[in-house]
Amino acid sequence: MIKLTKAEKNGLHGEITVPGDKSISHRALMFGAIAEGKTVIDNFLMSDDVMHTMGVFRALGVEIDHTESQATVIGKGLTNFKAPSAGLDMGNSGTSTRLLMGLLSKQPFDLNIFGDSSLSKRPLRRVADPLSMMNAQFELSNDEFLPAVIKANTELNGITYHMPVASAQVKSAILLAGIQAEGETTIIEDLPSRDHTERMLRQFGGQIKTDNGVITVKKQSKLSGQHVLVPSDISSAAFFMVAGLITPNSEITIKKVGVNPTRDGVIKLLERMGAEITQKPIASDGEPLADITVKAQTLHGIAITAEDIPGAVDELPILALAATQAVGDTIISGAEELRVKETDRISTVISELTKLGADIDEKPDGMVIHGGTLLHTSNGSTLLDSHGDHRIGMMNVIASLITEGDVVLTGEEAMSVSYPGFVEDVSSIKREWL
């Protein structure tokens, strides 16, 4: 339980470097493990979720060393993992679970996988179904959930799969199985989802074709270890972008942020709301990077629809907070995906922000946020809850910066899933400037 206070009248100022991208850190570990030779990962995110991915590969016999911001992986190739002595703990990580269901679907031994109570409520059928079409075999609790068994298997077959809903996790699971499968595996996307897996497969020497939403891979004979520079996580940077925009008299620069065009939906949506966001590109061999500067300014309500969701699904909680401060209404629709995140984020976003006086209507697939609300506590103090969800916890911290009265946050430990040290970093730009 921690006490949070409003920002000073002169606002938030300074430069901040947020931790490495969670999605890319997961994938760098995975590709490093299945490659041959050494992979060095810089600006590696040491968060709870990513450490569970690391723990899985160590249990499978992969040698991994790390310092505070670098990991070194000695790859074993795709066929040299050892059978673990116990079940594989996914913690709270949906990324680990879904991607590894594909990556580990062709091992000569059963793999028992389990997670915490939150992860055990998240559906797995939508990733298990296409993988089963490839001859992968799973035993899921109640045919849907963890704990589960990835069954021993010696053969995968390529498929053509039309994605029913844009999902980078499902797509990546199929691709990671596809590089081990006989024949071609083709995925058809109507809406683009984040493409970190495709980019990283190329970086590690894999063959992949992408053409206007059609992605094709074949069985890969060998991948080679690489040096991977992980950009700062745009999903984490989004909290500081919104903080700078909605806290009066602020100006913040967020350094070396990954601005992959399949992930920068939050920037596009904030710009549609009227934000002027300055990007200063940084030369990079891998993912595109930029320094991002924001200043306090007036925002306007917009409509966020299904086609916007894949590029900004993780940022919708903090966008909802921004919308409470915008002029006019913001309508979020086509966002059913939020209901199967770490929490039902439609419900938890509304639960927490309305405690501070926000005016929000819940819809089955989103919400309507009536803007222009001065956030305030009840009787001088309000208790907010992270609900065990890192992004809800971080949204609450940013909300406190513009809230009259004292805010007390419970469940703050959830933020370490993606951003250990988040509260300290917020404090560093919040201190009173002379």
From Swiss-Prot:
Keywords from the UniProt entry: Amino-acid biosynthesis, Aromatic amino acid biosynthesis, Cytoplasm, Transferase
Gene Ontology molecular function: any one: 3-phosphoshikimate 1-carboxyvinyltransferase activity
Signal peptide: none
Pathway listed: Metabolic intermediate biosynthesis; chorismate biosynthesis; chorismate from D-erythrose 4-phosphate and phosphoenolpyruvate: step 6/7
Positions of the catalytic residues: 314 (proton acceptor)
CDD domains: EPSP_synthase
Residues annotated for 3-phosphoshikimate binding in this entry: 22-23, 27, 167, 169, 314, 341
EC number: 2.5.1.19
GO cellular component: cytoplasm
Residues reported to bind phosphoenolpyruvate: 22, 94, 122, 169, 345, 391
GO BP annotation list: amino acid biosynthetic process; aromatic amino acid family biosynthetic process; chorismate biosynthetic process
Enzymatic reactions: 3-phosphoshikimate + phosphoenolpyruvate = 5-O-(1-carboxyvinyl)-3-phosphoshikimate + phosphate
InterPro entries named in the record: Enolpyruvate_Tfrase_dom, Enolpyruvate_Tfrase_sf, EPSP_synthase, EPSP_synthase_CS, RNA3'P_cycl/enolpyr_Trfase_a/b
Source taxon at top rank: Bacteria
Top EC class, one word: transferase
Annotated compartments: Cytoplasm
Subunit structure: Monomer.
UniProt record similarity statement: Belongs to the EPSP synthase family.
Summary of the function given for this chain in its UniProt record: Catalyzes the transfer of the enolpyruvyl moiety of phosphoenolpyruvate (PEP) to the 5-hydroxyl of shikimate-3-phosphate (S3P) to produce enolpyruvyl shikimate-3-phosphate and inorganic phosphate.
Protein name: 3-phosphoshikimate 1-carboxyvinyltransferase
